[in-house]
């Protein structure tokens, strides 16, 4: 498994774990998953999580495709492949 695939799997797991610790209707920001994975990897750089932001959004898209989560903007469910700007992630309803 390559580093990108490894990061993708880790980010998917982080999204699931973060949502599992929140209320059923709660949302998370993709940056929370990126920060979690960067921390778990022991990155010494304070902003190492930033390079994981697009992979985190891609991980969320894969989870949407599997029916596990929904991506929202301004409180509305959106297509993550066309969403521009800040998004939130919640468990699928």
Give residue ranges: language-model regions:
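Long, charged, low-complexity intrinsically disordered regions
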Residues: 2-8, 93
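Auxiliary Fe-S-binding modules of radical SAM enzymes
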Residues: 54-59, 72, 91
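Short, cationic-aromatic polyanion-contact patches
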Residues: 75-93
